[in-house]
Amino acid sequence: MNIYDVLIWMALGMIALLIQYGIWRYLKGKGKDPIPLQICGFLANFFFIFALAWGYSSFSEREYQAIGMGFIFFGGTALIPAIITYRLANHPAKKIRESSDSISA
């Protein structure tokens, strides 16, 4: 392992931190930041970074088919919690039916 490999792994860690901070800010800005949404966003971030790390390590070992497999399995797995987090964060609140002041006949 040379210095470039170490720098790549450090960069992946920094990207993971920045993405997680972005997810936190996005949910905080929407006013919807409960723990389940944070965990779901973390899982999406984890699987995305894991897919990138898998791809890099497979590329450095010259296992080119493993790159595709990692992107399909782990990248596809990252889409599921990402979509759930996005849909729940943008889900409108239920409207409460207002009572009418006028009397209808």
UniProtKB/Swiss-Prot annotation:
Similarity annotation: Belongs to the PceB family.
Annotated membrane topology: Multi-pass membrane protein
Function: May act as a membrane anchor for the tetrachloroethene reductive dehalogenase PceA.
Classification of source organism: Bacteria, Bacillati, Bacillota, Clostridia, Eubacteriales
UniProt entry keywords in alphabetical sequence: Cell membrane, Membrane, Transmembrane, Transmembrane helix
Protein's recorded name: Probable tetrachloroethene reductive dehalogenase membrane anchor protein
GO cellular component: plasma membrane
Bilayer-spanning residue ranges: 3-23, 35-55, 66-86
Cellular location(s): Cell membrane
Origin: domain of life: Bacteria
